[in-house]
């Protein structure tokens, strides 16, 4: 299907991968599909896409897996973006148990000599980090940071097809 989407103008690909450890991925998602997803990522990188990005929700377990993510970008020219977990109306207990402030990940990256990559205006809310020994980059999307809304230029869709103009807003528009 990816070839078909490319023929119709696909230029970017974002894929959610909350863990690179198969067992942890299955625990988070409820499906054992990590090998197929990673095969699809490698296939997509061979196509003339402008950019491939992986998104992972930043959780308490992320620091234990940081080496797996960094190893993954060591040989692949792609971005892995960690998105700070947001508290919503229906995830208070999960949030309390799993929330990890983005600054903790940023501190770990900086201690390993990852440096902030200047972002062009309009590039979105991710704070990007690079390292001279790695082909890929690591991004951190921190909605609770002081300057998140200033750099946000995104519209978001829920899994139910509702358009959300703001992560912090309660309203949405059904597009179905």
Question: How should each PLM-predicted stretch be described?
Answer:
Residues 1-79, 83:
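Radical SAM/AdoMet-radical enzyme domain recognition
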Residues 68-75, 85-176:
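Auxiliary Fe-S-binding modules of radical SAM enzymes
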